[in-house]
From Swiss-Prot:
Ribonucleoprotein in keyword set: yes
The protein, known as: Small ribosomal subunit protein uS19
Biological function: Protein S19 forms a complex with S13 that binds strongly to the 16S ribosomal RNA.
Family according to the record: Belongs to the universal ribosomal protein uS19 family.
Example of a GO cellular component annotation carried by this entry: ribonucleoprotein complex
Keywords: Ribonucleoprotein, Ribosomal protein, RNA-binding, rRNA-binding
Gene Ontology molecular function: rRNA binding
Length: 14
């Protein structure tokens, strides 16, 4: 899922 920008990048690279 894509919610934040840098916070999600650490969880998923998509």
């Amino acid at each position: 899922f894509r919610g934040h920008d840098k916070k999600d990048k650490k969880i998923q690279k998509k």
